[in-house]
Each structure stands twice: as C-alpha cells, then as structure tokens.
Amino acid sequence: NLHIIGTMNTADRSLAMMDTALRRRFDFVEMMPEPKKLQGKLVNGIDLERLLIVLNERIEVLYDREHTLGHAFFMPVVDLRDGNEQKGIEANEQAAFIELQNTFKNKIIPLLEEYFFEDWNKIRLVLGDNCKKSDALSQYVFIQQHTASYNDIFGSGHGLETYEDKKTTYKLADFNDESAAWHQPLAYKAIYDATVLKAVEKSTNSDDEQESSNL
C-alpha cells in the first residue's frame, strides 16, 4: 500500500483550482494553530499561549481564520527556554526572549504587513498599540504613529484641501534602541493584557506631579 502525505496552504488563493481537484481525490485534515502546545510556557513573564491566542483573535476579526499564526512561530522560543540545563534557567530565558524579539521583527511583523497590504493601523490593532496612547507608554509601542498637517509638510498653498488636511505616517520602533518596545517584556504582555501598563502610567504621572510640586 502506498500512502501519500502532503501539506498545503489553503490560504493561498492562487492554488484554488488545484485545491478543488485535490479535495476530490484525497482526505483533507485541517491543521489549525494549537495554542495549548505553548501552555505554561513563560518567557520573562510573557505567556506565549495567551500571546498567540490574542494575536489570532485579532487577525481573524481583521482578516480571516485561515491566516491565523501557527504555534510553530513560537516553538524555537520554547526550545531555547527549555534548552541546555547547564547554562541555567536565567541564561535560557534570556536566549528565548532574544528569539522572541527576532520572531516578531523578522517573521510576524513582515507577515502582518503582507496580510494587511501595509495598512499599519490594522497592524497596530493586532499588536495592541492603540491602547498605548499616553506619552508615558511610548517606549512600549511597536509601531509609532505621527500625524502632521499638510501645511506643516508642504507649507501653505499646496492645493490638497480637496482630499484631507493632514497625513498620518507610521514607522517601526528602532530595533537597535535597547529601550524600545522590542526589548521590553511588558510590551509583549500588553498585547494580550493592556492592564499591565496601568501601573507604569500611574507611576509616571505620580513622578510628574511630584516634580511639579517641587518647582
């Protein structure tokens, strides 16, 4: 007996005709993301299971379920976390966190860019950056947003009032900046739990009030 086993990305619509032909001849088994494979896996306090679940909930709403992220994105992170016992837990966890940073920078963010055709506002929604509005939380924002009027950009007499009078631009936080969101465990936690930043915001506001009272 000959068993033919293969994998296919049904989200790729260019394969639609082939997909139909294959479905008539083979049994199809859907392989969806399995967040439970990440259960109990924490890296610098970041719950990988909750992170994947929330990312996929948002992608499903903004796009569709076939484009949700597989748990395989985070398996190299888990492997490093549970890796070489001789290096110690702290060293393993740090290596895992660096891998998580690179996974977001080199895999997840570029994939989201492709999904949403560089609609950065939707990417911000997936990452929860829309919940980090105050200046005190700017270092936890992955995609920075800046709005400027056309007068500021072009000067007066630009003749663009027919369309709109301002432009919003986006840019990724600088990965080489050690204080940027990429390197902040709280930034990843805030993706699935925005309340973790409330203490930071409250502390910053208290410091500002204290400085004002000392003047």
Language model regions located:
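C-terminal regulatory/interaction module of P-loop NTP-utilizing enzymes
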Residues: 1-215
